[in-house]
Amino acid sequence: MHVVIQFRMPIKFQDTEEKTTGKNLYSYQKGAIDKIFERFENSPNDYHLLYQLPTGGGKTVIFSEIVRQYLKHHNKKVLVMTHRIELCKQTSSVLSEFGVLNKVIDSKAKLDDQNEFSCFVAMVETLNNRLNDDKLDISDIGLVIIDEAHYNSFTKLFKFFSKSFVLGVTATPLSSSIELPMTDNYDELIVGESIQDLIKNEFLASANMYSFNVGLTSLVIGANGDYTVKSSEDLYTNNEMLSKLMEAYKERCDGKKTLIFNNGINTSLFVYDLFRSAGYQVAHLDNTASKKERTLILEWFKKTPNAILTSVSILTTGFDEPTVESIILNRATKSLTLYYQMIGRGSRILKNKNSFDVIDLGNNFHRFGPWGSTNLDWQRIFKYPNYYLDGVLSDEDLESNFIYQMPDDIRSSFKNSKDVYFDI
């Protein structure tokens, strides 16, 4: 196959004019921008580049500055894709802060004025419909940016941009589907600043992780490779698990602003009733809530010091509340990406906050290792995802390594015995 390489004018961050809009960029963000433009300058027109940076590292800020610089130096347009409408609006807002005039392509958007814009922001499904209807002119799109690129919903749109440079950004370069590895759709991965470095340099809060062993052998793995909602609800709504949740909360989180993640709406409602009956300030949020309800709940959560918010999936991406002090994983997951997304919601740093607590009630810590583990090699995971996934321990293997401690009241009955053990 004949590949045409177009050489472009080099763009370095330090060569550009001083910005009067946007946010101040940190040195690691400037370095990432330089690396990305270096690839852009020396790669084929249709090169697909993936950039990894942890949640809280400022991916949106980085690609917004990239868009600003790109539009200044190239007579082409930019398209930014997201997988949720909330992210569309947030992305559009940040781009505007950087002085980038942009148009959100949603189901209600009129396209009569599309020629007046050089940057578009669109949700993947809406964009797919508009492109199949031939209602959006993409003939002049030179740069495509994909936020949360690990989601597979974006891959069906690549056929429309066969002559565009594609930049995918993600915190976890591991595809949401085993059948569609990211290495099939991206030519190269650039790994950004690590979680440990961001913590060391006071850009992220550190996580104090507490794991409570849970028997998970009753859980069923579904077609998507993760535990089914039905089997999770059966386990996490039983009295034993609800009691364990309350005990863990009282032991580690009592009086702290806490975000609880569940796998299933019924589980979250059970959790809501559990804490409400105990006299705690608690709210429940899932994807059936209206925009108004969601806004009111999140405003309440923000301003209430010791609030508890129990949720289902909806807050794993696009949610930024730095005042969160504790995260409870009241679920198990086989997804490394979801594990990092959930914990990342507590990692925003504040003047009086440099750490947060994580309660794991799904053996996720044992499955994936500590959040920000230096043992994670993102380049290897990107290139050989199956090798990584095959190395993740099964629930049976995890539970066989558990060490059970005898409760103090029972141990006191054998106070004259030096060595005591029991089998469960």
Describe the role of every protein-language-model region.
Residues 189-259:
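Conserved interdomain linker/interface between the two RecA-like ATPase lobes of SF2 helicase motors
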Residues 45-66:
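Walker A/P-loop
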Residues 7-52:
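Conserved pre-motif I regulatory segment
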Residues 308-311, 317-332, 338-345, 355-360:
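A short beta-strand element within the Helicase C-terminal
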Residues 105-114, 270, 280-312:
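Conserved helicase ATPase core of P-loop NTP-dependent helicases/translocases
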Residues 151-209:
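Post-DEXD/H (motif II) to motif III coupling segment of the RecA-like Helicase ATP-binding lobe
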Residues 75-95:
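Conserved Walker A/P-loop ATP-binding site and its immediately adjacent core
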Residues 346-376:
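Conserved segment of the helicase C-terminal RecA-like domain
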